[in-house]
Amino acid sequence: YLEIRRPMEGGVISDYRSIEQLMKLLLADACRSMLFKPEVALCIPSTVTAVERRAAEKAAMKAGARRIYLIEEPVAAALGMGLDISKPVGNLLVDIGGGTTDASVLSMNAVVTKNSCKVAGNALNMAIQRHLRNRRDLFVGEPTAEQVKKEIGCAIDPDPERKLEVKGHHLVSGLPGSAVVTQFEIWKAMEEELEEIAACIHG
């Protein structure tokens, strides 16, 4: 049988052995032609504990890294966007990942203040799945919920006229089924999680 695992939960390692195996595969693929062990940069949430930092470093070392550089995710995201964070001006950056939302103010190449919550993309997907199951008797997998979120999900000003057909399995008959949902309906399904994310940003 096929077992699917999530080695990362909430932005930190939840399955140490799986993350170590995954890192070994990634390093082997990226460093096929290298004679020496590579130096590795790891992105970590800005709110991780010292224990979680050490776990990330240890996993990378066991996977074959020679040296590890830990970069806080908001800094990495800002650099990836081409945002100039070297000036003495505050830049608000919100990173909504899978397991965590990080809200940070960056200035002078550093995180000045930060806040984090464990409500993010995965929680929004689950809210959509729960709504379709409870209100439409339709079971959908996480990839379908993700697609719904990307296609008609919104955080403000939902359009009640915008619609999407969602396919899944009908809970009563067990047969393939579908439902037409509106953007307003999906926004309402995610409302509680969106409020938590907004509170994290304002916090």
What positions do the PLM features span?
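Nucleotide/phosphate-binding catalytic cleft detector across ATP-hydrolyzing
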Residues: 1-96, 104-203
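Conserved Rossmann-like nucleotide-cofactor binding loop
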Residues: 99
